[in-house]
Amino acid sequence: MINDRVIVPLDVPTLEEAIALLDLLPRVSFWKVGLELFVSAGPSILEILKEREKRIFLDLKFHDIPNTVAGACRSATKYGVDLLTLHATAGRKALSQAVEAISTGDKPPKLLAISLLTSINSRELAFDLKIPLELPEYALQMALLAQETGIDGAVCSPQEVSQLRQVCGSDFLLVCPGVRPTWAEAGDQRRVMTPVSAIKAGADYLVIGRPITTASNPVEAWEKVCQELAEV
């Protein structure tokens, strides 16, 4: 089902609030656990999601020396998560060691490289980070680096997904945050696109958070997203 390609973030500070969201949105099959909740609740939230037979996107964005990144990825496989993130800028060696580290697991997660945070715009890339590339070119270079090392896919802005799909091929997973329905505000995401447009551009999964979870009626918001995607 197309709805199974929507990942909803549990971007709340406590385990109790996370459970409340799970209870409120039982039809959501794929949930993202990020830094805030994981630091607060620890592996307990992953165990709860597994008990409820939900798919898990563990979005901790590992970025450290190669040995540490590899060890963190190896530890994460023990929780049975489906998707796991690390920064492409950790470098070729860290990416390669991460791939090797999870290869011995019974059901290893798909590794996703963060190409560039969707909150970063072209001015920040050039003037703050001193990277002399346009956003699409930089995102492509990071995705290609990840693909060369055996990483399964990338997290990227929907603005870059069409180019990445064309260059990286159909087997490279593309997960897009920065997806906003036509009726939702962009918030702090700079490079956004509607769910239908992102899927048509080549995204495998969409991360849609605040338009659903902070809506006055989250259940209604979820249904509206599903209705939009029914067009695809």
Swiss-Prot record:
Keywords of this entry: Decarboxylase, Lyase, Pyrimidine biosynthesis
GO process annotations (BP): 'de novo' pyrimidine nucleobase biosynthetic process; 'de novo' UMP biosynthetic process
Keyword Cell membrane (UniProt): no
Pfam families assigned: OMPdecase (PF00215)
Matches recorded under InterPro entries: Aldolase_TIM, OMPdecase, OMPdecase_AS, OMPdecase_bac, OMPdeCOase_dom, RibuloseP-bd_barrel
Coiled-coil residue spans: none
Positions annotated to bind substrate: 11, 32, 59-68, 118, 180, 189, 209-210
GO CC aspect terms: cytosol
SMART domains: OMPdecase
EC id: 4.1.1.23
Domain of life, per lineage: Bacteria
Entry's Gene Ontology molecular function annotations: orotidine-5'-phosphate decarboxylase activity
Presence of the UniProt keyword Ribonucleoprotein in the record: no
Active site, per annotation: K61
Enzyme class of the recorded protein, top EC level: lyase
Catalysed reactions, as listed in the record: orotidine 5'-phosphate + H(+) = UMP + CO2
Metabolic or biological pathway, per its Swiss-Prot or TrEMBL entry: Pyrimidine metabolism; UMP biosynthesis via de novo pathway; UMP from orotate: step 2/2
Family designation: Belongs to the OMP decarboxylase family. Type 1 subfamily.
Protein task: Catalyzes the decarboxylation of orotidine 5'-monophosphate (OMP) to uridine 5'-monophosphate (UMP).
Subunit structure: Homodimer.
Record-linked NCBIfam families: PRK00230.1, pyrF
Protein name: Orotidine 5'-phosphate decarboxylase
